[in-house]
Regions:
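A short, N-terminal "cap"/entry segment at the start of jelly-roll beta-barrel domains
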Residues: 1-33, 40-41, 115-137
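Conserved short histidine dyad/triad with adjacent acidic residue
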Residues: 20, 36-54
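Short histidine-centered beta-strand/loop micro-motifs
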Residues: 25, 46-53, 71, 95-96
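Glycine- and acidic-residue-biased ligand/ion/polar-headgroup-sensing regions
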Residues: 55-67
Length: 137
C-alpha cells in the first residue's frame, strides 16, 4: 500500500471546541508542525506570542474568511490566497472582524530536527496556558 494519508478537515481531532484541529498528528507528519486554527467573528483572545523559546518560524495562510495578523506593531490583512511568514522573534496575534477565519499554520525550526509538542498529539489534553500554546504548530 502507498504511504499516503487522506482525510477531510472534520476527521481530524478537534480541541478548544473545534478552534484547533490536530492536522499534523492526524496525517502522521513528523518533519514540521501543522494545525488548522478556526476563530469566530470579532475574536480578540488569540494569544499574542513569539517563538524565541524554540526558534520556530511559522507560515500562515487563510483557507476561508478573513483576519488581521498583528506583527511588530503592524496590521496585515489576510484572506484566501495570501501567505505570510513570521520569524521566531516577532510577536504575532490574530484578530477577526465581522467574519470568522480558518487558518492553516505551518511551523519548523530552520536547520533542526522537528520535535512535536506533546499537546499536539492526538488524544493529548489541549494547552492549559499561554506558555504551552506558544508552540502551537
Amino acid at each position: 500500500m502507498a504511504d499516503v494519508t487522506v482525510k477531510r478537515l472534520d476527521e481530524f481531532e478537534a480541541v478548544y471546541g473545534g478552534g484547533m484541529r490536530r492536522v499534523r498528528a492526524g496525517l502522521g507528519v513528523s518533519s514540521f508542525g501543522m494545525q488548522v486554527i478556526e476563530l469566530p467573528p470579532n475574536f480578540e483572545l488569540y494569544p499574542e506570542h513569539n517563538h524565541t523559546h524554540d526558534e520556530q518560524e511559522e507560515v500562515y495562510t487563510v483557507l476561508n474568511g478573513r483576519t488581521t495578523l498583528r506583527v511588530g506593531g503592524e496590521d496585515h490583512e489576510l484572506e484566501p490566497g495570501v501567505f505570510v511568514r513570521v520569524g521566531p522573534a516577532e510577536k504575532r496575534k490574530f484578530v477577526t472582524g465581522d467574519e470568522g477565519v480558518r487558518i492553516l499554520a505551518l511551523g519548523a525550526t530552520p536547520g533542526s530536527v522537528y520535535h512535536a509538542p506533546e499537546f499536539s498529539e492526538e488524544g493529548a489534553p489541549p494547552p492549559s496556558n499561554v506558555k504551552a500554546h506558544e508552540s502551537s504548530v
